[in-house]
Amino acid sequence: METLSNIVKDLRTERDLSQGKLAELVGVTRQTIISLEKGSYIPSLLLAMKISEVLEAPIEEIFKKESM
């Protein structure tokens, strides 16, 4: 089974963004960001691209496929 890990929380805190502010900037709810950071939500490509733009990091750096 494969999962998608991410470093959204690390990058978000490095940039001094709250979950709510990141959610606002990418057009989702704070709960979506919480779920994403926990790994229980896999974003659409469009959302991943928006997060990449806001966090100023390449998508492939933020999101990584892992085998379990």
Predicted regions and their residues:
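DNA major-groove recognition helix of helix-turn-helix/homeodomain DNA-binding modules
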Residues: L46-E61
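Recognition helix of helix-turn-helix/homeodomain-like DNA-binding domains
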Residues: V28-Y41
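Key DNA-contact positions within bacterial/archaeal DNA-binding proteins
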Residues: G20, Q31, E60
